[in-house]
Amino acid sequence: MCIRDRKAVFDIADGNIKKDTAEIAPIIDEAIKGIQAAAEKPDGISGLPSGFNALDAVTSGWQPSDLVIIAARPAMGKTAFVLSMARNMAVKHHQAVAIFSLEMSAVQLVNRLIASETELSAEKLKTGRLTDEEWQQLHSRIKALVEAPILVDDTPALSIFELRAKCRRLKQKYGIKVLIIDYLQLMTAGADMRGNREQEVSLISRQLKIIAKELSIPVMALSQLNRGVESRPDKKPMLSDLRESGSIEQDADMVMFIHRPEKYGITVDNEGNSLLGIATIIIAKHRSGAVGEVNLRFRAELTCLLYTSDAADDRI
């Protein structure tokens, strides 16, 4: 192990040791306060709302210290989904969101947010061919994003140790309330781990959970699925489809899949209902709550962002 990576490991270990053992009484007091705070909220959402009502009803919002894995095959809308939630948390609820984009540049990522916020298609924004009215719409609606507490880091090939150091600084300086990583398999665990990808991914997922606990914020990490999902008739993902490491499932407090049947030519369900424009969020693991499925509306023309299917005013 190189000196830099060894020092990072020692620093992490030292940080964990410094946390004192506590007696149960003050912990109970803290737990009771949390229960009382949840009881006082009329919507029953104890965590940070995603903005999707049906999803929040199942999850009760994103909880501090939770590691949430959002997985899907390519082009299913993983980035669109988390960007939709990031926009809602930052613009609507004024919570600081940190996004680490290892796949797209910061400008590409923000262009997606602009498309969603302005309701101007990605194609129009790409070509710049806007009418005078659309230019006015762009400048008028973009103000909400300009003022939003969204932080973007597009450092490529980021190591888990660099991520942890950056997140500590962001928590101290901006008070970030949620961390988003796009996506897990593009991270590294240092030079010593290269060549053993399964062990590397295991270390990364374990450290992401540690970051969530250390900073007391939800950490949402996108993940790829293997091709096994495409061998099934219904094409629905399962926990066994998580790519490269079973430790991802083990470390996660929640595992969610994004499933778009129409991508596989499945346009109606067993009851004859249309599946066009539908994205199903499958909650396959939920350590502290229920599992199940939630249907959301998919808007491909707005850079594949997800909208709720059951409430017109829930635009994210």
List each model region and its residues.
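Conserved small/polar residues in nucleotide/adenosyl-binding loops
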Residues: 1-5, 307-316
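Core recognition of P-loop NTPase motor domains used across DNA-transaction enzymes
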Residues: 4-64, 120, 134-136, 140-152, ...
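Cytosolic-facing regulatory segments adjacent to core modules
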Residues: 57, 88-175, 189, 293-297, ...
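The Walker A (P-loop) glycine that initiates the GxxxxGKT/S ATP-binding motif of P-loop NTPases
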Residues: 72
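Walker A (P-loop) phosphate-binding loop of P-loop NTPases
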Residues: 75
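Conserved lysine of the Walker
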Residues: 78
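Hydrophobic positions on the alpha1 helix immediately C-terminal to the Walker A/P-loop
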Residues: 81
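C-terminal regions of RecA-like/P-loop NTPase motor modules
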Residues: 127, 133, 159-176, 193-195, ...
